[in-house]
From Swiss-Prot:
Cytoplasmic side: 1-20, 335-948
Protein name: Sensor histidine kinase RcsC
Compartments where located: Cell inner membrane
Response regulatory domain span: 826-940
Membrane topology field: Multi-pass membrane protein
Gene it is expressed from: rcsC
Species assigned in the record: Salmonella typhimurium (strain LT2 / SGSC1412 / ATCC 700720)
Length: 948
């Protein structure tokens, strides 16, 4: 219910309110009228139902009387049975004794056997039936009695009345009931059967009852009766013109005693109840359905709805007229009383408004403990039961503090801990009640919330401890695994640089491959653990996606060629020259996908396609390998999941590679998807946002514009990419089909030349070529399919055109022919582990550096004080003085030489700690020769510049 905002309204609003009240009164009168009409309708329905009940009682008496007759006849038949041979005993017979008529119910019914075996019993029973007919049959209105043998299934008919009976229909119905009785479950075989058959005339039928006759707990025969039924048997004379329909237990209409128009179709809801009274669908008729025990039949009485409404039609018209008159009178009176009633009420508006505001604030309070406290002294004026209980929990000091807070009106809530350790939060608002300043207080038991907050705090502390334990575990595992692995991989790297005897080189290579695989497994597990513990961070910086792709293809091209596969790398011209992201993690993801493609592909090729897709950089890796079943694609990115059928089981791995890829791409705000078909190959597509992308300027290369290249490329994808790339550079392309070329034309093929090319040059794209384009014969260049995007640079070289960095995104790679000379660099190696210390010294020696060694930080300071050291390469975790304190001490001494840390801890926090201590960089064990060479080259160049 909505309360009015204020009782002090204008007179105009008051008049509208009074009119609304008059309307409500009129609606109330209309409701009463409707209620009266409905009551009259219910009364009429009650009268009709009473007549229905009287008729149904008469029908019930008819059925019950027939059932009683059956019991009497059954008693007579059973008393005339003897246990001898299961036949009836003979009685004294007179000369007028007749044998009943026999009717076979089935084709194999043996009536002769029944007549001969039961002759005496049947004659005795026939004599009694005749006697019973002459003395009692008229009272029971029976047509005939029949006996059916249980063994021969032949019916002995004892006619009690001469009347036409439809023999075929009766025998058919009896045959059906006998079959139903014989097929019934054992617990139902002792029940009586009742049914009704339609007579030759409408409104007349025949009622049948069948009961079993037992002798010594054995079924001997079935005793049945036939009785005519008429309309007067089922409703009282002089009643309403109602329809009478008898239905079976399935709701099927058996007979209508008022003609075919009176048949009522039974509804399923009727059959669920023994007695049902109501209207049929569409409200066409009012019906009463009642069961007729002990039979399974039901009787349905019906009358048209027009007959029900006949008496209340005038009442409805009178009610409508009355409501019209009352409505007119009410609205007339409303206009008269508007000026006489509401003007005196304005003086009471202020009091009513305060009362209304008070009630609204009560309703606005929470449905908890509510009380009204007087502001002056804090006395409880009014409270509910829950508030009374809470107030009794407060101590005297709590009450005084609550009173002071209420009087001060500085805050509107207070938390109180009661004497029984119940946490109460008391909130209040100030108001007026009975001309006094009061505070409406709401008391809430927040003990559960306080306990929950404490539990959450404990859970947070437990989670923090678990995170710290996980970090410690990762650091320990990383250090303990990487330290010995460094000794293995490092020494194998050095061993491969030496000249080895025949056969030993193969063993060293196998050992190096196995150790590299072990390192990859350890790295995958540590990366996944760092991702799960949220310790792995994306380090965005500006990088060139083209350089990343060139580096990846250069690393994997030898492996692809060794497997006799093809690696096609298509970098679209619209790919940015630079963007912001983490190139190391992107390279890790693409390398993992490319490595999987190589492992699972034995025949065909692998395509690496890089292009722009809206605001994303799309990188697609497609192979022609074994493919992945559809049911396993959905689990492909689950941790430790490996495809478990066929060839895949032969490959090694932890099942973490794709899971790490998905998480890394997600951390870069990108996504990864897969499309695979078993036997056809797989396609992985990853997308990363184009943050800070700088696109190449669309500008043709001067000198290439107008040149013509003939294409004889069978690979459709390769051909389309070449056409797009050369069109951007202004080169005209045509499909070569044996035409005569011009002198400056160039032929581009992806297969060996069949004839000598008469043009300027021919470029052959070879799947097995590794490295930069080479001129293996005059005018014949071989080009790798892994660097198709560098074709314009080769054409510029053929046409002797100087490259413009703004026109082309990349140029041909050049080999560095200057050898490094590092013998001017003295490096101090600090490590407490003798194997690692010796290994680092050997690696530095193989790179041309001079080095000195120290056992720990203290020994390193001693070496620094006596020798001129250019670079310090120090382990982090050492006894006496670790790498952190050593670096801090070096910086305190004012030395600015580069300090590079070496740690077996793979956590990001460890590397950050190294940088914070003053180190210039940090390397993770195992440190390969390539990593060591690249890192030291940077700092060696810095030292040389400082010397200069």
């Amino acid at each position: 219910m909505k309360y009015l905002a204020s009782f002090r309204t204008t007179l105009k609003v008051s008049r509208y309110l009074f009119r609304a009240l008059a309307l409500l009164i009129w609606l109330l009168i209309a409701f009463v009228s409707v209620f009266y009409i409905v009551n009259a309708l219910h009364q009429r329905e009650s009268e009709i139902r009473q007549e229905f009940n009287l008729s149904s009682d008469q029908a019930q008496r008819f059925i019950q009387r027939t059932s009683d007759v059956m019991k009497e006849l059954k008693y007579i038949a059973e008393n005339r049975l003897t246990a001898e041979n299961g036949v009836m005993s003979s009685r004294a017979r007179d000369d007028k004794m007749v044998v009943p008529d026999f009717e076979p119910l089935f084709a194999d019914s043996d009536c002769a056997a029944m007549g001969s075996a039961w002759r005496g019993s049947l004659e005795s029973l026939a004599w009694f039936m005749r006697y019973w007919r002459d003395n009692f049959s008229a009272a029971y209105d029976l047509n005939r009695v029949f006996l059916i043998g249980s063994d021969n299934l032949c019916m002995a008919n004892f006619g009690l009345r001469e009347m036409p009976v439809e023999r075929d229909d009766a025998l058919k119905a009896l045959h059906e009931r006998i079959m139903k009785y014989r097929n019934a479950p054992q617990e139902e075989s002792g029940n009586n059967l009742f049914w009704i058959s339609q007579g030759a005339r409408q409104g007349v039928g025949y009622f049948y009852a069948l009961t079993p006759v037992y002798l010594a707990n054995r079924l001997q025969a079935l005793l049945g009766v036939e009785q005519s039924i008429r309309m007067e048997n089922f409703f009282t004379p002089g009643s309403l013109p109602m329809g009478v329909t008898i239905i079976d237990e399935n709701g099927h209409s058996l007979i209508s005693l008022t003609g075919p128009d009176g048949i009522i179709k039974a509804e399923p809801r009727w059959m669920q109840e023994r007695s049902w009274f109501g209207y049929t669908p569409g409200f066409r008729e009012l019906v009463l359905k009642k069961s007729l025990p002990p039979s399974s039949l039901s009787i349905v009485y019906s009358v048209p709805v027009d007959l029900v409404l006949e008496r209340i039609r005038i009442l409805i018209l009178n009610a409508i007229l009355l409501n019209v008159l009352v409505g007119a009178g009410l609205f007339t009176l409303a206009r008269m009383y508007e000026r006489r009633i509401f003007i005196p009420a304005e003086s009471d508006a202020q009091r009513l408004e305060e009362h209304e505001q008070f009630n609204r604030k009560i309703v606005a309070s929470a449905p908890v403990g509510i009380c009204i406290l007087r502001t002056i002294d804090g006395v409880n004026i009014l409270s509910n039961e829950l508030a009374h209980t809470y107030l009794n929990m407060l101590t005297h000091e709590d009450r005084q503090r609550l009173t002071q807070i209420i009087c001060g009106q500085q805050v509107n809530f207070v938390d109180v801990l009661t004497s029984n350790n119940t946490n109460l939060q008391i909130s209040f608002v100030h108001s007026r009640y009975r001309n006094e300043n009061v505070a409406i207080c709401v008391l809430v038991d927040v003990s559960t919330r306080v306990k929950m907050e404490e539990s959450l705090q404990e859970m947070a502390q437990a989670a923090e401890q678990a995170s710290q334990s996980k970090s410690m575990f990762l650091a320990t595992v990383s250090h303990e695994l990487r330290t010995p692995l460094y000794g293995i991989i490092g020494n194998l790297d050095l061993l491969q640089t030496k000249e080895l005897p025949k056969g030993v080189e193969r063993l060293v290579t196998a050992m190096n491959n196995s150790s590299s695989l072990l390192l990859k497994i350890i790295s995958d597990i540590l990366d996944f653990s760092k991702i799960e513990s949220e310790q792995l961070k994306i380090e965005p910086r500006e990088f060139s996606p083209r350089e990343v792709m060139n580096h990846i293809t250069a690393n994997y091209l030898p492996l692809v060629v060794r497997k006799q596969l093809g690696l096609y790398c298509f970098i679209e011209p619209d790919v940015p020259v630079s963007l912001n992201g983490d190139p190391m993690r992107l390279q890790q993801v693409i390398s993992n996908l490319l490595s999987n493609a190589i492992k699972f592909t034995d025949i065909g090729c692998i395509v690496l396609h890089v292009r722009c897709d809206g605001d994303y950089l799309s990188i697609r890796v497609r192979d022609t390998g074994v493919g992945i079943p559809a049911k396993e694609v959905v689990r492909l990115f689950d941790p430790f999941f490996q495809v478990g059928t066929g060839v895949q089981r032969n490959f090694q791995g932890t099942g973490l590679g794709l899971a790490i890829c998905e998480k890394l791409i997600s951390m870069m705000d990108g996504d990864i998807s897969v499309d695979s078909e078993p036997g056809m190959g797989s396609q992985f597509t990853l997308r990363i946002p184009l943050y800070g992308a700088q696109y190449p300027v669309k500008k043709s290369v001067e000198g290439l514009a107008g040149t013509c290249c003939w294409l004889a490329v069978r690979n459709t994808s390769l051909c389309q990419f070449i056409e797009t790339s050369l069109a951007r550079s202004g080169v005209h392309t045509q499909r070569y089909e044996g035409q005569e070329p011009a002198a400056d034309d160039i032929l581009i093929v992806d297969d060996a030349l069949e004839h000598t090319w008469q043009g300027r040059a021919a470029v052959v794209f070879c799947r097995r070529h590794i490295g930069i384009p080479l001129e293996r014969a005059p005018g014949e260049w071989v080009h790798s399919v892994a660097s198709v995007h560098e074709l314009p640079a080769l054409l510029a070289r053929i046409y002797s055109i100087e490259l413009d960095s703004e026109a082309l995104s990349s140029a041909l790679p050049t080999t560095d022919k200057t050898a490094d000379s590092n013998d001017d660099m003295m490096i101090l190696v600090v490590d407490d582990h003798p194997i690692n210390r010796r290994l680092l010294a050997d690696q530095l020696g193989s790179l041309g550096y001079q080095c000195k060694t120290a056992n720990d930080g203290v020994d390193a300071l001693n070496v620094l004080s006596k020798n001129a050291i250019d670079i310090v390469l120090s382990d982090v975790n050492m006894p006496n003085m670790d790498g952190y304190r050593l670096t801090q001490r070096i910086r305190q001494l004012g030395l600015t030489l580069p300090v590079v840390g070496v740690t077996a801890n793979a956590l990001a926090e460890e590397k950050q700690r190294c940088l914070e201590s003053g180190m210039d960089s940090c390397l993770s064990k195992p440190v390969t020769l390539d990593v060591l060479k690249q890192t030291l080259a940077v700092y060696a160049e810095r030292v040389r510049k400082t010397r200069a």
